[in-house]
């Protein structure tokens, strides 16, 4: 999920679970505008932080925050073992940024509009609390 300057720059846990492993990957600060990714591999070069969440409904999730040109500062809350859906995980200091979620195969199924737009290179605007897919029951 890419946040633009006018978005709320706090992010939350998407499910109840147990958080483990927290790592920071130093890097540079390119813009996270999709056009920039055509020029340089921003998801490989930008400053990043990631953690793993063993979630109740979606298996193990990798949650990664990517710093951006106007942000740079990723402010994650101290790691707690048990977390709750909707609990604040952290925030970006200012500007636009990206949040990446990686899931186990066949555990999460994105909604069709997101799949179609992504295949066409179009971002889908989402808001906190809006559905973006479903977990395998």
Task: Label the predicted regions.
Residues 1-137:
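Contiguous, well-folded functional domains in the mature portion of proteins
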